[in-house]
Swiss-Prot record:
Residues 111-117 are annotated as: Complementarity-determining-3. One of its GO terms (biological process) is adaptive immune response. It comes from Homo sapiens. The keyword Zinc does not apply. Residues 72-78 are annotated as: Complementarity-determining-2. It is found in: Secreted; Cell membrane. This is Immunoglobulin kappa variable 1D-17.
Length: 117
């Protein structure tokens, strides 16, 4: 059975941090996609300037609070399935789901969790 459901992704995320002297623009692509169970899915997040590895990924389902998947660009949060992985440093980052499961259909966000002067 082919389960094709659009996985909604955040297209543009502008973040402001208290005390930070600059704003770093984060852009995700694709902004939306269609995928099937078992597919390998990759989402890209780009920073306008280098942010080292200060990047986190979150998953959010309708009516639920965001779930923290990955921190420091590639470290898997406790309890998150190993099919999720993150990579990248500097300005380009990726979130990969190696084999999409029905429970993975959701919105995914990247978050730059530290700012630089």
């Amino acid at each position: 059975m082919d389960m094709r459901v659009p996985a909604q992704l955040l297209g543009l995320l502008l973040l402001w941090f208290p005390g930070a002297r600059c704003n770093i623009q984060m852009t995700q692509s694709p902004s939306a996609m269609s995928a099937s169970v078992g597919d390998r899915v990759t989402i890209t997040c780009r920073a306008r300037q280098g942010i080292s590895n200060y990047l986190a990924w979150f998953q959010q389902k309708p009516g639920k609070v965001p779930k923290h998947l990955i921190y420091a660009a590639s470290s898997l949060q406790s309890g998150v399935p190993s099919r999720f992985s993150g990579s990248g440093s500097g300005t380009e980052f990726t979130l990969t789901i190696s084999s999409l499961q029905p429970e993975d259909f959701a919105t995914y966000y990247c978050l730059q969790h530290n700012s630089y002067p």
